[in-house]
Amino acid sequence: TVYVYFDTLSNDIQRIKAFYNVRFFRNDIQGKCDSLHYNVADSMVYMRDEPVIWAEDSQLTGDSINIKVKEQTIDNMLMHPNAFVIQQDSIKGFNQVKGKQITAFFKDNEIDNMFNEGNAETIYWLRDDDGSLIGINFSQSATMDIKIKDNQISNIKYYKNIKETLYPEEQLKDNMEYLKGFLWQEDIKPRREEF
């Protein structure tokens, strides 16, 4: 069941358009934007005007977000331009993926992998098997293919113009653990009781 809140609705047989303070809630995914269009013919959801999606521990943003739906589940999600994915690693840490365009591919309603194109950047907190912090990895490349396992980054393949640095926690300076444009928006995440 998906719960949706909006101020204005335009509805015809093939398209649903919701405007102004659009919010939706489903147990495994929540979202917010100012303009949402659903096209029945191609099963596409188009989110505009400061769209934000929360899926499990991840927050996904971009100037626009396009979602492909198959059999009532998300197949893939395109965030562009200014795409940014943030995943809470711990109370203190946030894994981050940033680029001009990020396509997230879903499996069983969870992000399975992401393809990051154009000025791709990541920050992720590298931990050993017992959860102890090894360091914080900063990387940049033209494109990246990022595999996700158990809602955590498990592998990254870098392509072209690769720069990567691993910093022990004690070598971090103020705000080094955040990519430019970082904005954690947990406080505006839709909750079930709002609907």
Regions found by a protein language model. Give the residues of each.
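Structural signature for solvent-exposed beta-strand/loop edge elements and short helix-capping sites
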Residues: 1-195
